[in-house]
Structures are given as C-alpha cells and as structure tokens.
C-alpha cells in the first residue's frame, strides 16, 4: 500500500533535503521533488546562487529518478517575509525571516501547492525535527475532516499533532518551525528527525549525492548572502545618523548611520575606540544607541519580557497554563542557544509574560521567544516589550539606599500588567 503514497519533498539543492527525498524513496513512496525560488537573484547579482541551487536540486531528482518541479514564490516572499523584515528593522526590532519563511512560504504556499496542485498525500522537508505522528498516521490525515464552522463538534476527537525536537539536539530546527500551522504539520514528514548530520552526510556519500555533499552549508539570511548586514539594510532604508552614548555617564563616544542598524547585545564598532563596547539600549526618539564597556555588563541582562499573541502549535495554550494562568517551561530566543528555564504568565489577550529564572544576555525586541516543555516545542511569540535590565534595577536599588523616603510603588513592568 505504501508504494501508492505520494510525498512531495521540498528540495533546496543542499544535502539535507536530498537525503530526505532519498529516504522517502527507500520507504517505497512515490516522491516528487520541488524547488522553491523565493528571491530574485537578478536583482542581487546572484548572491543566493539560486540558479545553481536549482540545478543541484534537479540533479538530485535525476539521480533518484523522481519528477522535478520548480515554483516561484518571489512575490509572496517579498510581501510576507522581506517587507516584514525591513519594517521590523525600521522600528528598531530584530526580526527572524527564517521563522516567517517557514510560516508563510514553505508551510503555506508550498504546502498548498503540493496538496492542491500535485495531489500530495503528505509533504516533506529536510528539517531536523520530529512530530508525534508515524508516517502512516500522517497519510491518514488526508481523510480526517477538519471541523466545520466556528464551533467544533464536542464529540469529535482531533488530538493535536506535537512538534518534537530532533534526535540531534545540536542540529534541531524546531526553533524555525515554531510558527507553523497545525494543519500543515499534520501532513508533514521529517525524514531526518531521528538522524545526526554526520549520518546524513554518510548516506549522501554512499548514494552518489556527492554534488550536494561538497557544498558549504548555508548560514545566515539567504537574501543577504555574504554581504554586510548594515550595507544591505542601507540599500533599502534611509540613514538616520545618531550618536553612540555611554549608558554609564552619558558621554558621547561616536556617531552611527542609524539606530535601527543595531541589535541589543552586539558589539558596536565605534571609530577611534580600541576597547570593545556593546549595544545595550536604543532610543528611537533621539536616535541614540546606548552602549556599555563590557561583554558581561549588567545592562545586557534581563529576566522579563512580553510577547505578542502566542502562536501555539496545538492551536490553543497548554491546559496547565489555561488552568493556572502560569506555567513552568523553557524558552530560547536564538537558534542553538541553551534552553532557559522560565515561568509563563498568560494574559487575557493571548500574550504572555516570560520570567526567566536567571537573567539572560541580549534579549531584543522583534526576536521570537520559542517555548519548550520537555522535548516538545509548544510554539512562539514575538518579543514586543522588555523588562528593565539588571543595570537599571541595580541603579534603582542604589538610589533607594541614598533616598529611603522614595516610594517603592513606582510604576514599572510587571507580569500582571
């Protein structure tokens, strides 16, 4: 029966998606490879090498003897991913286009193309991730009717599919999948979920996929390529000159081309200064970038943030969080960073306060806080508000010691607000 199952696999021209397609073929499925063109390389002198990637994906299909299709989502990528990327930077935030690409392009545009145009029973990608469904359960989703209307039949049981971390914890990519819809996840297979990167390379070497094995792994944002992020952004955004200001004594240390070019935690390259300074705050009104002199300066550390309305993989918040309004779990805001123990506080509007057990370095507006409970990725929310830094709190304590009559009920950030 499995020989009749049709799986459409996204091919990037890299080793991971190539081996994913190979493994699906080995399982006896009817496999179709699809290459997505998401960026117009003609505008960027081929920075992303999209044409070469497409050729490599086509060659994979030839080696595996499977059909090849190419689709263009350049317009959709520009509207749903790149425009948001620029808008977020212009607001002084630090966006993650990879998360939005998976949400809007790979698991929406590509997913619907595979199912509606190619008649796929399931889709597959080369991501290092797992779900709570076995392959055969994924295929059964094709015949599971989605609830109609605003209210679900209370007798209908439709258990949500869980997004689980990959066996290779270092390569795990659930961070980038934390905004994927439940409907798309139900029909998705991740063939590499139980494998290590080294084993994937070994499979490629043993199956004549040398042309993708020899390619360097793509890192960073595709449409930027090897270029400097600041130079790239200034091609699209107007410069807004401002000052670098010391957070400790308000000394002006230098000038910059735009406060939106800097992310909290990064090193600020200030002309004429030999010692390193780091971005700790940004003042969009004045255009100033506040900096501190040490990589471990307390102004870099915070333990409180608030997100926008959280996208839960299961479509609804965990039952414990709904019941108690608070829940212990873990989160991260950068791929591959260590998971941070935290407490979530659920607000009525679906946003959450995140209180880290220990202050973390480099939290920035616009980043995604991705939540985990054990091996399960619960979902994510965009960071829209930050609590005070450890440096600000310390200054407040010092002022209180000097002026004990000062009120301790001054307004500020609090998880209940």
UniProtKB/Swiss-Prot annotation:
Keyword match DNA-binding: no
Show the disulfide pairing.
101-222
For the keyword Disulfide bond, the answer is yes
Q: Which domain of life is it from?
A: Eukaryota
Region annotated Interaction with target base in tRNA sits at: 96-98
Gene3D superfamilies listed in its UniProt record:
Adenine nucleotide alpha hydrolases-like domains, HUPs, Translation factors
Give the location in the cell. Answer: Mitochondrion
What the protein does comes down to: Catalyzes the 2-thiolation of uridine at the wobble position (U34) of mitochondrial tRNA(Lys), tRNA(Glu) and tRNA(Gln). Required for the formation of 5-taurinomethyl-2-thiouridine (tm5s2U) of mitochondrial tRNA(Lys), tRNA(Glu), and tRNA(Gln) at the wobble position. ATP is required to activate the C2 atom of the wobble base.
Q: What is this protein called?
A: Mitochondrial tRNA-specific 2-thiouridylase 1
Gene name, please? Answer: Trmu
């Amino acid at each position: 029966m499995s020989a009749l199952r049709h799986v459409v696999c996204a091919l990037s021209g890299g080793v991971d998606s190539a081996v994913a397609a190979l493994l699906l073929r080995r399982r006896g499925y009817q496999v179709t490879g699809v290459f997505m063109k998401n960026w117009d390389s003609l505008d960027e002198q081929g920075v992303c090498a999209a044409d070469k990637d497409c050729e490599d994906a086509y060659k994979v299909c030839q080696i595996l003897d499977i059909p090849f299709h190419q689709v263009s989502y350049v317009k959709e990528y520009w509207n749903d991913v790149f425009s948001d990327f620029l808008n977020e930077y212009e607001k002084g935030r630090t966006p993650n286009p990879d998360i939005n690409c998976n949400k809007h392009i790979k698991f929406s545009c590509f997913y619907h193309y595979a199912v509606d145009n190619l008649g796929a029973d399931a889709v597959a990608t080369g991501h290092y991730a797992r779900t709570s469904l076995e392959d055969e359960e994924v295929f059964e989703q094709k015949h599971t009717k989605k609830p109609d209307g605003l209210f679900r039949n209370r007798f209908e049981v439709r258990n949500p599919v869980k997004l689980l971390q990959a066996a290779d914890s270092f390569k795990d990519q659930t961070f980038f999948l934390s905004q994927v819809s439940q409907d798309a996840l139900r029909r998705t297979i991740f063939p590499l979920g139980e494998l290590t990167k080294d084993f994937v390379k070994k499979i490629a070497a043993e199956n004549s996929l040398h042309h993708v094995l020899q390619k360097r792994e793509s890192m960073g944002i595709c449409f930027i390529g090897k270029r400097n992020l600041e130079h790239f952004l200034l091609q699209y955004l107007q410069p807004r000159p401002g000052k670098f200001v010391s957070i400790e004594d308000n000394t002006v240390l230098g000038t910059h081309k735009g406060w939106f070019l800097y992310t909290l935690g990064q090193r600020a390259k200030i002309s004429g200064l030999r010692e390193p300074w780091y971005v700790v705050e940004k003042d969009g009104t004045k255009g100033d970038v506040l900096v501190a002199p040490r990589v471990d300066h307390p102004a870099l550390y915070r333990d409180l943030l608030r997100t926008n309305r959280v996208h839960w993989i299961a479509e609804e918040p965990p039952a414990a969080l709904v019941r108690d309004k608070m829940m212990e779990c873990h989160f991260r805001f950068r791929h591959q960073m260590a998971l941070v123990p935290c407490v979530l506080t659920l607000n009525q509007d679906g946003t959450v306060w995140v209180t880290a057990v220990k202050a973390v370095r480099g939290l920035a507006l616009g980043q995604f806080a991705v939540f985990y409970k054990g091996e399960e990725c619960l979902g994510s929310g965009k960071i829209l508000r930050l609590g005070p830094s450890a440096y600000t709190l310390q200054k407040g304590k010092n002022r209180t010691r000097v002026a004990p009559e000062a009120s301790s009920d001054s307004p500020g950030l609090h998880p209940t607000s």
